[in-house]
UniProtKB/Swiss-Prot annotation:
UniProt EC number: 3.4.23.-
Function: Probable aspartic-type endopeptidase which contributes to virulence.
One Pfam family here: Asp
GO biological-process terms attached to the record: proteolysis
Glycosylation sites: 82, 104, 209, 261, 315, 320
Keywords: Aspartyl protease, Glycoprotein, Hydrolase, Protease, Secreted, Signal, Virulence
Leader sequence residues: 1-21
Entries under InterPro entries matching the protein: Aspartic_peptidase_A1, Aspergillopepsin-like_cat_dom, PEPTIDASE_A1, Peptidase_aspartic_dom_sf
Chief place of localization: secreted
Similarity remark: Belongs to the peptidase A1 family.
Keyword Protease in record: yes
A single GO cellular-component term on record: extracellular region
Name of the protein in question: Probable aspartic-type endopeptidase MCYG_06955
């Protein structure tokens, strides 16, 4: 139980730091505000099997047996921005980021409710680590805190470290004149390679967090309130099992195509690392029985052992996938499950993949079609259909 209490306390402290600085935001009361993601056009080519491996690693799950270390390294090394395979941005879900201003510098950060640190790329990094990133210059506007250093490590093995400065921060019109900012002096190569973002803003809120992500369009994060204009119908709530410190709950069935299994109960963790689309928890990772039944409805689909996941011809029309939440049906459009094309082929990699050990994980493929409420009062989690 200590895990969630520690993180929730850290989030609430950061909320107080922001809300005390600005009592009114866009007509809302203190502590209630919205963030709209910004579109970012990236030339980086992601190799889908590597992204699956990275997701499994983040959640401490073993990779599929056929996905060897050699193939992972080969995939990652050859299919980056300097790779030889040409892929147009439209073949992947467009990338979206969250814009902030630190000092006089505009940066793009990931919003992460799974961590409590606020750190950014800085001019104190080695020059090779700064390449293709927007940089915070603490020497221009910041006040260094003597004898203050930091280090962050994440579940996927990545990390960063550096010094601490006080500086002004602006997030969606929410202004703080003297915020502690962790300026990186070292970051792992994965963050250097991830050119879409320049740091992580880790925080949570006292009451609830809400996310409304979109498919190939900017999503929203509303903090402290529920915007009724963004969903249809009354949200359906499920209790959370927080024993392991996760947003974990039990669903009571699923359906796909002609298959309707309303008695198959399964536990799942709802991905709450708000990084869209290709970092954090992008996939829906469900029990093997569910994924096999879904792909049995997809013509010419096959389990690709070399790449460790289900794939299918890119011109295939995919059926919707539905998760039963009491009387509510959470529909994931088939088009959202067409996650990415394997470079140099006419084969697409699915956003729905199997996971060997419970619980299942519902990441971006699920979230971007849903209106989801993370409510710390309970705790509980709510689901409703997005309003188009």
């Amino acid at each position: 139980m200590m895990g969630p209490f520690f993180y929730f306390t850290a989030y609430v402290s950061l909320l107080f730091a922001f809300t005390q600085a600005l009592p009114t935001i866009n007509g809302a009361t203190a502590g209630l505000f919205s963030i709209e993601q910004k579109q970012y056009r990236s030339n980086r080519v992601n190799w889908p099997p590597y992204e699956l491996w990275r997701t499994l690693r983040k959640h401490h799950r073993p990779p599929p047996r056929g996905m060897t270390a050699v193939s992972r390294i080969k995939a990652y090394g050859e299919h980056t921005i300097n790779g030889t395979v040409e892929v147009t941005p439209s073949e992947y879900d467009t990338e979206f980021v969250n814009e902030i201003t630190v000092g006089n510098d505009t940066l793009y950060v990931d919003i992460d409710t799974g961590s409590s640190d606020f750190w950014v790329f800085s001019s104190q990094l080695p020059e090779q680590s700064q390449r293709n990133h927007r940089i915070y210059h603490p020497e221009e506007t910041g006040t260094k805190l003597p004898k203050h250093t930091w280090e962050s490590k994440y579940g996927d093995g990545t990390g960063a470290a550096g010094n601490v400065f006080l500086d002004k921060v602006n997030l969606a019109g929410l202004k703080v004149s003297s915020q502690a900012v962790e300026a990186a002096t070292w970051v792992s190569y994965e963050f250097v390679d991830q050119q879409t973002t320049d740091g992580v803003m880790g925080f949570g809120f006292d009451n609830f967090n809400l996310t409304c992500l979109k498919h190939q369009a900017p999503g929203f994060y509303d903090f402290g309130f529920i915007d009724g204009t963004k969903h249809v119908g009354k949200p359906t709530y499920l209790p959370i099992d927080s024993l392991r410190g996760w947003w974990e709950t039990t669903f009571n069935g699923f359906s796909a195509g002609d298959i309707d299994n309303s008695t198959y109960r399964f536990k799942a963790v709802i991905g709450i690392n708000f990084e869209l689309p290709d970092t954090g928890t992008t996939f829906m990772l469900l029990p093997k029985q569910i994924t096999e039944q879904y792909y049995s409805t997809v013509p010419a689909s096959m389990y690709d052992r070399n790449n460790g996941g289900w794939a299918f011809p890119c011109n295939t029309t995919l059926p919707n996938f539905t998760i039963h939440i009491n009387d509510h049906k959470a529909i994931v459009p088939g088009e959202h499950i067409r996650w990415a094309q394997l470079p140099g082929t006419n084969t697409c990699f699915g956003g729905l993949q199997p996971v060997n050990n419970p619980p299942a994980i519902l990441g971006g493929t699920f979230l971007k079609s849903q209106f989801v409420i993370f409510d710390y009062d309970g705790p509980k989690i709510g689901f409703a259909a997005q309003r188009n």
